[in-house]
Amino acid sequence: MIMETDVKNSRYYLNRELSWLQFNKRVLQEAVDTSNPLLEKLKFLAITSSNLDEFFMIRVAGLKHQKENGVKRRDIANMTPTEQLENISDACQKLVAQQYMHLKGILKELETEGLVFIKPVDADERQKQWMGNYFEREIFPVVTPMAVDSSHPFPFLASKSLNIAMLLEKNERDEEMDEENDIDVKTAIVPVPSVLPRIIRLPDVSEANSRHCFVFLEDMLMFYAARFFVGYDLLEARAFRITRDADLYIDEEDAQDLVVEVERQLKKRQRGQAVRLEFEVGTSRFMRRFMTQEMNLEKEDMYQIDGPLDMTVFFGFCGIKGYNHLRYPEAHPHSPWSMLDLKRTPETNIFDMIREKDLLIHLPYESFDESVVNFLYSAANDKDVLAIKQTLYRVSSSSPVVQALEKAVQNGKQVTVLMEVKARFDEANNILMARRLEKAGAHVIYGLVGLKTHSKCTLVIRREKDGIRRYVHVATGNYNASTAKLYTDLGILTCNDRFGIDASAFFNLLSGYSDPPIWDSFIVAPINLRQRCIELIDREIHFAKNGEDAHMIAKMNSLLDKGIIEKLYEASQAGVKIELIVRGICVLIPGIPGISDNITVRSIVGRFLEHSRIFWFRNGGREELYISSADWMPRNLNDRVELMVPIEDPEIKRRLKQMVDIELSDNQKAHIMQADGTWLKTISAENQLCAQEYFQKIAEKRDAEDEMTLAQKLEPYTPVLGHGDGSD
């Protein structure tokens, strides 16, 4: 008999950081997936690098602080900060080596398409002449070489900046010094200007030539380095890159003005402690020792790079004109299915549609502009709308959402916005947007002390013939027009009275001193979301112990909360079938005999970033479905304001169940977690089904067809969920 306390044993949990690195490895695998176009494979390398940058700036930096402060506390997997850092370094060294091995293969493939990266020394005479002129005209005036000696201390180098370290010696040395073997070696740093293009296209031999050559800016700088140090011989020149701690340390309790304090901390971000040094392969021991000593780094913080440093440079290159055949076909968001059959006359507005039925929006396949932005602009311009209230966590830099809110203020609406200024790496943009809204005349609040407001909710108050009506939008993803084209998310537009009453109470809780109400539909963190999730799992345990069919499915970005995982293990032991779809971190281990036999975990990594959270519980045949802004992580359940809402509309429940069904049937982009914590990608040659492609095809083809009829015309999939027994 398995003791309940067994589920607390650390051997049943993975380390958070190593689990995240496994996720980034899954992203890296897309760079060698032959189903992806060539430039998209290159983009996945850039994504992997961007992910690693943030990982070091936040997660590794935090662990280094713990180590320096003597913290010995063990994590969920029984690892100390020091042990975690050692394991992270080993895993990252292997991951980076794989990255650059894959890059070499992709660059060779690009050569067959006529896109060739060369070193300046390998350029022909015509190209070298052009490079020399370009260097003198465009580069030399901008670059500032900096000596490093007793009168020139090692310069401050910004996080993620690219630099060149150089060793020099006088080309006319003192003979006595030569006799004594005391060569006077100088060191210098040349920052690679970020204001100049990093990838430089060389002129083609002719217009008809199909071979296009490119060089990296740092290679050109090193090729012409002698121009900066007249009278010196160049002994060595190597590119290197520093990553610094970028977390913000904000004391909200003592801060008199939160926005001012965030701005103050943002100024410190670029000057954080160095946490990683990347340098070119072939860098001498003397140069490595020189750089690590100056930046107070250890051996485990050093990464030797066999290729161009910072692959995020390829984000821009992947958009090169004239090579559409090397990219995904352009994906255009389509009209939301829920709205198609409601567009009857030009006079029909979105409020008419919502009154007729709840609307489901499935991003990025369905249009954010036609749904959410339309909803906000309609509210801004509608003479009967009295007020708009909205939470904003991340918005795009030229946000149509903010523009709609500004328009609403101009039209005399009461506009209240909770702008979360602590959204990591979006702090500056959010502060800018908040000040724009304040200047327009909106009421802007900045959340609750000690909590990030991560929920996605909009409330529109409208006067109608039969009285005041509340229109509500709740979603799993941000009000960000840019990421709405890249992330898979779900949103609901409704005028359900229970949602409306709860939404009013929710905004009162955020803006004033109101005590939490007794919620009718909303489930709110950190108030009762954790408790409700535990209750829902307990209910399935009850059914299983009574011999009934017990089944639950949860889709999220990350699974980290130990309390939730212990409950999932308990449910598995009781016989509950548990299917988890987790894109990123998952410290739960499935398939452990006697502990998690009934749990499976899959992760879908593809063209779009899986971001929606869906929770399905069989509930003895009376199925319940929820969507949420929250993952099952301590920060979401304890330290953030989050929302989870039940899905009540039968049509939306049916559609959501079909979505989950298809994702559980994906056999092209799904990775299955094994009982040893590793992941295995599933690729089937028969009955191929890629969930993201499937949803895209439906969005493209269903304008005049019933969705279920259309589904029969697409690739078949095997249903996983039972759709009978009172499923609606």
Where do the PLM segments sit?
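N-terminal localization/anchoring segments of enzymes in phospholipid and broader phosphate metabolism
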Residues: 1-552, 570-574, 586-728
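Cofactor-pocket helix-loop regions in the catalytic cores of large enzyme subunits
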Residues: 557
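Glycine/threonine-rich ATP-lid/beta-loop region of ATP-binding domains
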Residues: 562-565, 569
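Hydrophobic alpha/beta core scaffold segments
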Residues: 577-581
